[in-house]
């Protein structure tokens, strides 16, 4: 009865396949997390946040439709 | 129509202090609605600017879409205020006035109040939003007439400079607002002005930022029922 020996080339292909599958899994996880919508605040949470926020002292450069007062420090120039 | 609009608006005794606009007969009260009429939330802060406004800036809401009944238009005003306050964090609805598809004028911040609708113009302009998406469709006649009447009223009362300049939002900001069709319309109105470099602001000929925002979050609690629509 011939002895079954592990073929080095077969072992190499199996290792490569595992590596590629792991890479693919990582890519999928990253893509999913990037595309996942950030949890939206409920209306009550929005109202609470707004209530706690001080008034905007100067709105002369504001555009309420396109800009956010919450991100005012990061607005584009 | 403009003269009639002036008379009707004058009959209401428009007040800078946003009093209930129930003066005059039923027809008069149908023209201009106060903040309390549409159920506005109180502003966090109010800051005024001096003198008649030298600019009138026209906007479209894009969303909410056009409304044709007064209760729906009241809700649209509340939705816009919710978006500007709760989601964007500003002190109040950014516009001075809103115009509904019902032909009514809805008081936003009002005259001589610094707005939040057009950077660098907020302390010298009246911002008027025509509720709806006017990129490809022209607003109905009653909306256009109401906007013209409001401007004429502002001039008559001294809130708007008689030599005012009429602008579209896209002329002062990189945006599609007030929509191509409406912008084409106001371009033919009296006092429409092309801004050039000599005035310090370049006009935008190719806006690249669509005027799009998500629908305001659905309320967890029902609003108190809006006041009955004014008799027309």
UniProtKB/Swiss-Prot annotation, chain B:
Keywords for the protein's UniProt record, in alphabetical order: Disulfide bond, Glycoprotein, Hydrolase, Immunity, Innate immunity, Metal-binding, Secreted, Signal, Zinc
What are the inducing conditions? Strongly up-regulated by PGN from B.subtilis. Regulated by the imd/Relish pathway.
Q: Where is this region: Disordered?
A: 213-232
Instruction: Give expression by tissue.
Output: Widely expressed.
What superkingdom does the record give? Eukaryota
Site feature location: Essential for zinc hydrate coordination: 95
Show the CDD domains listed in the entry: PGRP (cd06583)
Q: Which cofactor does it need?
A: Zn(2+)
Give the SMART domains listed for this entry.
Ami_2, PGRP
Task: Tell me what reaction this enzyme catalyses.
Answer: Hydrolyzes the link between N-acetylmuramoyl residues and L-amino acid residues in certain cell-wall glycopeptides
Q: List the disulfide bonds.
A: 67-73
GO cellular component terms, alphabetically, are: extracellular region
Biological processes per GO annotation: defense response to Gram-positive bacterium; innate immune response; negative regulation of biosynthetic process of antibacterial peptides active against Gram-negative bacteria; negative regulation of peptidoglycan recognition protein signaling pathway; peptidoglycan catabolic process
> Quick one: which residues bind Zn(2+)?
59, 169, 177
Gene3D superfamilies xrefs:
Peptidoglycan recognition protein-like
Per UniProt, residues of the N-acetylmuramoyl-L-alanine amidase domain are 53-179
Cofactor binding annotation: Binds 1 zinc ion per subunit.
Q: Where does the signal sequence lie? A: 1-15
- Keyword Mitochondrion (UniProt): no
Q: What family does the database annotate?
A: Belongs to the N-acetylmuramoyl-L-alanine amidase 2 family.
**Name this protein carries in UniProt:** Peptidoglycan-recognition protein LB
Please name the source species: Drosophila melanogaster (Fruit fly)
């Amino acid at each position: 009865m011939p002895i079954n020996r592990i073929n080095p080339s077969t072992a190499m292909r199996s290792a490569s396949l595992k590596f590629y599958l792991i890479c693919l899994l990582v890519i999928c996880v990253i893509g999913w997390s990037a595309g996942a919508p950030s949890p939206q605040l409920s209306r009550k949470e929005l109202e609470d946040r707004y209530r706690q926020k001080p008034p905007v002292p100067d709105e002369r450069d504001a555009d309420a439709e396109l800009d956010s007062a919450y991100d005012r420090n990061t607005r584009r120039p | 129509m403009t003269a009639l609009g002036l008379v009707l608006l004058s009959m209401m005794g428009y007040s800078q202090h946003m009093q209930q606009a129930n003066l005059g007969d039923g027809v008069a009260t149908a023209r201009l609605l106060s903040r309390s009429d549409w159920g506005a939330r109180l502003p966090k802060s109010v800051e005024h600017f001096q003198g008649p406004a030298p600019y009138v800036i026209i906007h479209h809401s894009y969303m909410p879409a056009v409304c044709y009944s007064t209760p729906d238009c009241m809700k649209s005003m509340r939705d816009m205020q919710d978006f500007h306050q709760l989601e964007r964090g500003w002190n109040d609805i950014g516009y001075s006035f809103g115009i509904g598809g019902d032909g009514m004028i809805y008081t936003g911040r009002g005259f001589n109040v610094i707005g939040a609708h057009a950077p660098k113009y907020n302390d010298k302009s009246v911002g008027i939003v025509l509720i709806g998406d006017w990129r490809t469709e022209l607003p109905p006649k009653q909306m256009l007439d109401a906007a013209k009447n409001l401007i004429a009223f502002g001039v008559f009362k001294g809130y708007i400079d008689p030599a005012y300049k009429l602008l579209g939002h896209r002329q002062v900001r990189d945006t599609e607002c007030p929509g191509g069709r409406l912008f084409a319309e106001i371009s033919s109105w009296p006092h429409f002005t092309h801004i050039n470099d000599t005035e310090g602001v370049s006009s935008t000929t190719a806006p690249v930022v669509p005027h799009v925002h998500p629908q305001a979050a659905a309320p967890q609690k029902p609003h108190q029922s809006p006041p009955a629509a004014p008799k027309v």
